Amino acid sequence: MKTTFDPAKRAWTLVHRGLDFAVDAAKVFSGDTVTMVDHRFDYGEVRQISAGFLEGRMVVIVWTQRGTSRHVISMRYCHGKEEKRWRKILR
């Protein structure tokens, strides 16, 4: 599936988090992931939160389906407690 993103958000995330939407999101989605719909707010679109692994570290990606593309909104490494919760679901 094609990945799209806002170039400015990609650049910010690359500088501040060392994660690249263009390359790293595809790596995460090529492995085992768990995905849940984000119901916290009305975003005007269905946003999904996926957790998976990038080079052995757990990553969370917020994204939405746009046509046939997966549009990445944010991406970051998980914190300790958060990773424990996601690992329970991934098992």
Language-model features: locations:
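Ribonuclease/tRNase effector modules and their secretory precursors
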Residues: 1-91
